[in-house]
Amino acid sequence: MAAETATSKQNLVILGGSYAGLSTAHYLLRHVVPQLPGKESYQVILISASSEAMCRPACPRALISDDMFQQDKLFVSIPAQFEQYLKDTFKFIHGTVTSLDHQDRCVTVSVKDGDPEKIKCHAIVIATGASTASPLLGLNRDSETLRTNWNEFRAALPTAKHIVIAGGGPAGVETAGELGEYLNGRAGWFHSKLENPKVEITLVTADSKILPILRPALATKAEKLLNKVGVTVIKKSRVTNVTPPGAGAEDALTANATVTLEDGKELQADLYIPATGMTYNSSFVDASLLTDYGRVETDPGTLRVVNGGALLYAIGDVGSHARPAVHNILNTVPILCANMKRDLLLAVQPDASVGEDRQFKEDTRETQLVPVGRSKGVGAFMGFRQPGFMVWLIKGRDYWLWTTEGLWSGKHWAKGS
């Protein structure tokens, strides 16, 4: 049975230690807690299954070799990012949330290398994100596990002759492009495709085109770029079976696989990478608070959890308020924190003059940047098509690593908004 942690503090508890969780913690510590009456009574607690944060968008390239990125920038210690704050204002717990009681506002945590803890919360922010189908493409558990998976994949890569990737979204396209260029090189200027690639790489999508969020012309260009690094794209064909079961998952990461498509065609794979969709990390949340897809049902304007009671919020991929994307996370952090500040003030002074809620409105214009290999890519930003050079400059050169130092350290949130 979990022991309840005794504390005299009002705990503002954030569940999740990636873009949404760290950003929310920094914003609260910089711009919310200092403006609350009795500010000394509040403590921000961040709970994460990993003690390190990492630039998850970089996984399609990072999985190939440690030489692709400076490792001390790709992975950073979470506790180290918060040493700048007074000790009694912040606490980091390395563990996994196993249950959330939204009525009593408490969470139970399976602590890494420790006994389970039950924490009484004054406010809760659910920022646990989502897990990828492939254990190569995200922090599904912790950084140590991800590194172990990468090492196993890298050991199998030199002997692979056939690689199958399922999923035509950015993760699948980027992974195919990175592996294609690394293993096969790129076709010359006057060749539309790479003939006789060293490794046959096949990308399978159930959609009529890859990159469904982008306009058809950009999807077509991306497919041509994939062809130039030896990737064959199969469209309108869903993967219906993989043998052995679990191939590409953690327990059979590098197993040889037979991939069966819905038309009965079979593909033989020395390596199989499932890059289809995500599983939202919400198993600890009461089912009454979830959508049919497993996301936390979140008010699209205020970021409060629908039917969750007071002082319960969700942000990032796990929330239902917006399409999973880093730019949506960054746009919602100030709004969630402003509304939490309003709620915290009212909890102390019910008749306080706190103004109206701030409202988030998702920008649904075409926005997505997709590198295809080390120097090419396609994309659009706020509805405007971007040339390949801009895709490389903004994302493709290091997969956003140039932005993460400011986010992890909180410098990005130096000014409130």
UniProtKB/Swiss-Prot annotation:
InterPro entries, A to Z: FAD/NAD-bd_sf, FAD/NAD-binding_dom
Entry EC no(s): 1.-.-.-
GO cellular component: cytoplasm
Known pathway: Secondary metabolite biosynthesis
Keywords: FAD, Flavoprotein, Oxidoreductase
Single Gene Ontology MF annotation: flavin adenine dinucleotide binding
Positions bound to 6-hydroxy-FAD: 16-20, 61, 317
Cofactor requirements of the protein: 6-hydroxy-FAD
The keyword Oxidoreductase is annotated on this UniProt entry: yes
Pfam families documented for this protein: Pyr_redox_2
Known catalytic reactions: deoxyherqueinone + NADPH + O2 + H(+) = herqueinone + NADP(+) + H2O
Enzyme type, top EC level: oxidoreductase
Cofactor note: Binds 6-hydroxy-FAD non-covalently.
Family per record: Belongs to the FAD-dependent oxidoreductase family.
UniProt function note: Oxidoreductase; part of the gene cluster that mediates the biosynthesis of phenalenones such as herqueinone, compounds that have been reported to treat tumors, bacterial infections and/or mycoses, and rheumatic diseases. The non-reducing polyketide synthase phnA synthesizes the heptaketide backbone and cyclizes it into the angular, hemiketal-containing naphtho-gamma-pyrone prephenalenone. The product template (PT) domain of phnA catalyzes only the C4-C9 aldol condensation, which is unprecedented among known PT domains.
Protein name, per record: Oxidoreductase phnG
Organism this protein belongs to: Penicillium herquei
